[in-house]
Every structure is written in structure tokens, then in C-alpha cells.
Amino acid sequence: MDFLQRILGILSSEDVAPALFASSISVLFLILSYQVLYPPSKYSAFPTINGTRWLALSNRRILAEFVTDAQGLMRNGLEKYDIFRIISSIGPMTILHPKYTDEIHNDRQLNFMAVLAKEMFPNYPGFDLFREGTDGSTVLQDAVKFGSSRCLGKSTQLLSDETSTLLQKLWGDEPEWHEVTAKSSVHDIIAHLSALLFYGPELCSHKEWLEVTDEYASVGFLAARQLRLWPPILRPIAQWFLPACRRLRYLASRTRGLIEPVIAARQKEKAICYSHGRQPPVYDDAIEWTERAAKGRPYDAAMSPLLFSINALHTTTDLLTQVILDLSTQPDLIVALRQEILSVKPQQNGWKNASLNQLLLMDSAIKESQRLKPTESILMRRYAMDDLTLADGNKIPKGTVLGIPIFGMRDPKIYVDPDMYDGYRFQKMRDKPGFENKCQLVSTSPWHLGFGHGIHACPGRFLAAVQVKIILCYIVAKYDFKLAGGAPPKVQSVGIELISDTEARLAVRRRQEMVIGLE
């Protein structure tokens, strides 16, 4: 069954509905009370384009329309208004025209983690993975910044050493055409490389750990999607019955059971070393980075390190998959990328950051894929911690969830033929005055929000760029690849999520030409 159909099917699932029916009846009066206690408020200053009340979420038609056509709703809204409200799966959201991007991007009254708390239910059992940081703590953000800088120093060599072996295993050495599933193979590569970067020697090769944490992340996102389909007042009940939530609680327990003994053993080892006047060994992994970043502050030592690999696994997998699918229809661009790789001529001991920075065309092609297909259709989502007045006098009330739609990334005033893929686009734009440093993959701007923009821009984007470039170098240099036929790849839109095609197949074959530094 199609992924989107499965999501919508939750609304009428035979597995869930009977168990919830009795409980739903028992709280029906609460819904009526809620409408009395929480009438339309100051939020109604902006028009709502797909409903008039938050409790309209109980209307399946409104919710289904948002899940299947959020972009269409926003496009219609922007044709009429600069600011409007939309009933989303996390409640009412205020959508700002992209022209407001620069005005809000560094505003510290606007908080991202508070939005994450609304989207990912961190206080429900099993959703422990998404809890860190939603309480106002900055341990996670500090750990990501510290860990990313550590990874950049060691990642190029490590990734270079491993990528060739992984591709040989997953794509083979056959000179004849054969088929692979693009996203699943990319997922396996990113999962393995992330484990090497983020987990210590005890866990990076632990089969059960890798399987459980991978499933935990996938089920966590699925469970959150399912819960968002229920009216807010029913979610505390629904989470006990939904199959994905039940599975998530088991996976959370199993994850803790695997990582907590490792943490305990390290703490014991440190205590013994200190008692004998010795310095304990230093582990260069996410467990250690988070502990050092915390500086004595409380945090979830078992779950916080997982967020390094979870973010890398899902967002980087999606980006690299989309890049490969886009390139598979651009044979001339693939040839040009091979020539660029050869011109850089990495040393025999692998790629370095300096050589990766010379791959201007590759950088441009990746950024172009991200421009046309970011991970979400509403970016820079923020929660207003206080009342906010915009420069034009519009007032954003405290408690508003707001966001910027992606349409600015197809602005014809910035981009020529904005709906067309042009792998050379950002390489050429570097020559324009004022754009020299704004067209790199890791650069953020009001007209490219792929990694966000401002104080909440993705702190892991520098490491993600290194990962994608190294893997892509090996794929482009060592393999011919093209779409395997059938229907062209389609982006799946589920609410605000934009998901690269999970089923797209590639025809691949090993090239025989030797590439300097890649053999």
C-alpha cells in the first residue's frame, strides 16, 4: 500500500478505531467544553484559509486536505494574503510571506524547539528520543556544534576509507547493468558511516544496536505522524493504542537497555582511573561530546547521543537520494562532474576538506536538488515566546506557531527558469556581485532555506555536506547510473514533509576507468 494511503488509513484503521471508540465517547463532553473554554482569540486577526477553528482538526476532510495538499493550500493563501493562518496537523499555524524571512531569521523571541515539542510529543512514553532540548535546555544544541566540529576534523579520511567498500557491497562490481533501489542503498551507506562517526567502538559494529536505533528513529517519525492525525484532546488516549506508539515504547526500552551498560562501564572506568591518579581514556563520539557539552547540566545520557545519527541518517539520506535521482536524468552533467573530480586529483590517502571545497559544480548540483526538493514545505518554523510586531505593523501574538513556505526558493526574481533543474545554477551565480559567498551548499539565505536560516539554521549542515560530497564522488567516478525505467520518481508530500521517492530504481554498472585517489 502506498505510504500516503497508509497514513490516511490511520484515521479509520480497524486495528485502532474499536479500542478508541469507548474512550472517545467518554471524552466527547471534553471537546464540547474545550470549544466553550477556548473560543476564537486574538489569532483571528489573520484569515484562516482552510477552517475557522482549531477544533476543525476533528473534521477529517480538513485534515486530509492538509496532509495531501499543504503546498496547494499555502499557494492559494499567498495569492491573497501576506500573512494567513492554516489549520495544520499540529494546530493553527501562521504562514508568513517569504519577504519576512530576513526580518525574523535572528529574532530570539522565536523558538524552534518549542515547535518541535508540538510536532514530536516528547512527553509521551516512548518519544524520549525527541525530548532533549524541548524543555529549554541547550545541551543538545551545544553538543551538536561541538561534535560537528570534531567530526569535520576526522570525517573526510574515515568516510573516504569506508565508502568504496560499502558501494562495492551494495552496488556491486558487475560491468553489466543491474538494478538497485536508490533510497534503501543510500540509507544503508549513511547509516553505516554515521555509526562510525557518532558511536564508540562498543556500538558502531553492534548489529542489534544498529538495527534497533534505526527502527526506533523510523517508528518515532511514523508514530508522530499518526498522532498528529488525531484531535489534540484525544492524543493522550490514542497514543496508548496506536500500533506505532506501542512499538515505539518497546524500542525506547530496548535502546536504553543497549546503551546504558556502555555508559555505566565508561563511568566506572573513569572512576577507577581517577582513583589511581591516571587520566581515563578519551572517547571521541557522541556519548562523550554530549557529556562534555552538558558541563554538569542535567540531560538524558542514553537518548541525547542518538540525535546525532538520527538527524544525519534521515535528512542526509533524503538529500543524497534526491541528488542521485536528479543526476540520473542528466548524463552530460554526470560527465562534467567526473571531469571536475579528476581535475581536483585527491591524494592517494583520500579526500581532504580543501579538495572537497574545490568541487564547485558538485556543490552547485547538490544545492540545486535541495532548492527544488527540500525536506519540508514550511521552513523556519518558530514559536513566538512573546508578542512580536513586524516592521509593517502586523502583530504576531505570543503563542503563535509560524513558518515560511518554500516558494521563495523558486522566486523568478532570483532564479532564471525557477522550476527547472540546472546543476550549474549556483556555480554561475557565484560570479554575480554580492552572491560570491551565498551560493555555497552550506550557505543559508532568504532565497534558499534548505538548511534553514538565521540562529536556528542546521548546525550539522557542514558535516552533511562532507558526507554527501564524498559518497557522490565515489558513485559518479566508479559507476554509470540511470533510472531503471517505469514511472519517473515522485516526491511524496505528507503534510509539510517532502519525501524523496522511496521506491525509485536505478540501473547501475561498475565503470572500468581508474580514477586517481579513488582506487
Swiss-Prot record:
Pathway: Alkaloid biosynthesis; ergot alkaloid biosynthesis. Glycans are attached at residues 50, 353. It comes from the Eukaryota. It is a single-pass membrane protein. One of its GO terms (molecular function) is heme binding. It holds the Pfam family p450. Gene3D superfamilies: Cytochrome P450 (1.10.630.10). PANTHER family: CYTOCHROME P450 (PTHR46206), CYTOCHROME P450 MONOOXYGENASE AUSG-RELATED (PTHR46206:SF2). Belongs to the cytochrome P450 family. One of its GO terms (cellular component) is membrane. Ergot alkaloids are known for their toxic effects on humans who consume contaminated grains or livestock that graze on grasses harboring ergot alkaloid-producing fungi. Due to their strong affinity for monoamine neurotransmitter receptors they may also have clinical uses such as treatment of migraines, Parkinson's disease and cerebrovascular insufficiency. InterPro entries: Cyt_P450, Cyt_P450_CS, Cyt_P450_E_grp-IV, Cyt_P450_sf. SUPFAM superfamilies: Cytochrome P450. The keyword NAD does not apply. The chain crosses the membrane at residues 16-33. Disruption phenotype: Blocks the ergot alkaloid pathway at festuclavine, and downstream products are eliminated. Heme binds at residue 458. This is Cytochrome P450 monooxygenase easM.
